[in-house]
Amino acid sequence: MKTRPLGIGLLSGGLDSALSCVVTREAGADIRCLHFFTGFCVTGHNSRVGRTDRPIANHALQVAAEIGASLELVDVSEEYLPMVLKPKHGYGRNMNPCIDCRVFMLRRARDYMERTGADFVFTGEVVGQRPKSQVKTALRAIEKEAGLEGRLLRPLSARILPPTVAERTGLIDREKLHGFSGRGRKPQIDLAHRYGITAYSQPAGGCCFLTDSSYSTKFKDVIAHGGSGSLSVDDVFVLGVGRHFRFSPVLKAIVGRNAEENDFLARMAGDHWSAGVVGFNGPTAVVVGEIRDDDWVEIASIVARYSDGKNKESIEVEFVRGGTAKRVRTAPASADFVAIHRI
């Protein structure tokens, strides 16, 4: 009995990566999938914070279960962060280093392929779907830089790309692959209906914080104020929590937006000052940096602004660190003051 070739797939949990698995299998290969945890995924963030108002799921696990594919989760967050801070190919519209990200993941998939004796790597990329990383010239450059020339199958667009080694040697039936291109999703959605795939996440990069303008602004703020040299994965994670306010180059505050974020901030405060309103329901805030003089009142006024006492003439805010507590009475901040300091 002839042994089927083995393909290593990158499974994000999105529509295209899900389809790439099924199409590759139908074209004659066994598949094994990898899902990389980078620290910048929205669904992973919601799970860690404890969000209950949004669906919390790892779509890659759901898709793998639905299509019957083996899946290995790989934490690459510590290696991934330095690449994000200094991408060789630069950023997209926000802080998203899409080309460098692709090369990063494909190199690790190549290493896995070589360790396991697999025949090729495959992805759900579609020609022309993304303006920077999925035009034909970029696809070729990424494949070369990742060390996968001739061994990277893109089954959804294979018919409009040069045949890979697996196709040329008959390991994969090229006639069972597709020639999708462009930003339209209808062909993929129709194909998903045909295969009965329903567990995939929504398209358009919605899982990556780095494509989000608000998150990217906070990321740039940390880098601008000297944080890149000592930035950790946990620091990056906190950028997705709460409202962030800058008071000086060395002082900022994070104010929770809901009960889950308040609980999370209270847990992560550690050696930082935390703050909350006295006598009213309100947010938990964590202060990063040392508070000086007028900073107490300014921070307290913003915390008060987001409390149930925001319409009072003045309210008390309590700051706590370890066994030390300090109370400050202040008027809630004006909208203009909030706008000046919000990152």
Tell me the role of every PLM-derived stretch.
Residues 1-194, 324, 331-333, 341-343:
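ATP-dependent adenylation/nucleotidyltransferase module used to activate substrates
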